[in-house]
Amino acid sequence: MELLGEYIGLEGRRQQLRVPCEAPGVTDPFQSLLSGVAQMRELVTELFGSQVQQEAQDRVTAAPDEALDGDDEDDSEDENNTDNRTNSDGPSAKRQKTPS
């Protein structure tokens, strides 16, 4: 018995993951499956760990100032967005000034 998985990256590159489910000295098929699932989990963690590291390096290389900012949004957009209504269907959340 074995577990198979396939990861397709953003560029369309395929990577197959294959893990045998035979643990040495284990005769129970469920224990063997559990061992295989644990191994698959480790493979997936390694795969995504390397993907995350590569993406982080790409971001720093592409735009070091933006990567250090920690804000993925456009800063000029924040400055121009002064109307922060949450409910456009209802009345304004601001208190109306009464004439004195």
Swiss-Prot record:
It comes from Bos taurus. InterPro entries: GON7_meta. Component of the EKC/KEOPS complex that is required for the formation of a threonylcarbamoyl group on adenosine at position 37 (t(6)A37) in tRNAs that read codons beginning with adenine. The complex is probably involved in the transfer of the threonylcarbamoyl moiety of threonylcarbamoyl-AMP (TC-AMP) to the N6 group of A37. GON7 plays a supporting role to the catalytic subunit OSGEP in the complex. Keywords: Acetylation, Nucleus. Residues 66-81 have a biased composition (Acidic residues). Component of the EKC/KEOPS complex composed of at least GON7, TP53RK, TPRKB, OSGEP and LAGE3; the whole complex dimerizes. The modification N-acetylmethionine is found at M1. Residues 50-100 are annotated as: Disordered. Pfam families: DUF4611. It is found in: Nucleus. It comes from the Eukaryota. Its main location: nucleus. This is EKC/KEOPS complex subunit GON7. GO terms for biological process: tRNA threonylcarbamoyladenosine modification. One of its GO terms (cellular component) is nucleoplasm. The gene is GON7.
